[in-house]
Amino acid sequence: DSLVALRELLAVISAHEWRKKGVPVPAVQGRIYPHYGVFSPVRGEYVDLVATAPLPAGCELAFDIGTGSGIIAAVLARRGVRQVVATDQDDRALACALENVEKLGLTAAITLLKTDLFPEGRAPLVVCNPPWVPAQPTSPIEYAVYDPDSRMLRGFLGGLAAHLTPNGEGWLIISDIAEHLGLR
């Protein structure tokens, strides 16, 4: 016998449906297939922002820090960035991103790398959409939205300058829900 919280069970069922059917994302002209425990792009505001914000002039290389499902890397590749290095430290996220990159036919443009935050080198564009709740996750599904002690956010902000080319841009895409809830 085992006991599973209803919230956890509903999360597993939702993740299964998203993975089976995919989430339509117009900015990539296709669908993203999220895995359980990897953030699903069910709200499109941040995706639309990446799809429409002006890219740095001549941007042929970008870093996507904490790629998760690979959605930001895919949007950048669809926009014409020739090489996107997408990083994550989580094997589940990298497997999810790989599946999505392959299904979207973007393997030539996107390199996936397991590392904690930044790859080596510098890029004219470095993008990060970190988890937005500064708390400790208690289940696998929460890793997609919980950033203990804002570790990822602080690491991105602290390391960004060392990974930008001169006149490069860092894009931090983050929800303000933690501020509204008094968590940050």
Where are these regions (language model features)?
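Glycine-rich S-adenosyl-L-methionine
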Residues: P140-T165
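Short "lid" loop at the C-terminus of a central beta-strand within the Rossmann-like core
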Residues: W132-V133, S150, S175-H180
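Residue-level signal for inorganic ion chemistry
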Residues: N129, F156, G170
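N-terminal auxiliary segments of SAM/dcSAM-dependent transferases
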Residues: D1-V23
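Conserved SAM-binding loop and adjacent beta-strand
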Residues: S14-E17, H35-A51
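Short alpha-helix
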Residues: G155-F156, L181-R184
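Conserved beta-strand signature within the Rossmann-like core of class I S-adenosyl-L-methionine
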Residues: N167-I174
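Conserved SAM/SAH cofactor-binding pocket of Class I
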Residues: R43-C128, P134, T138
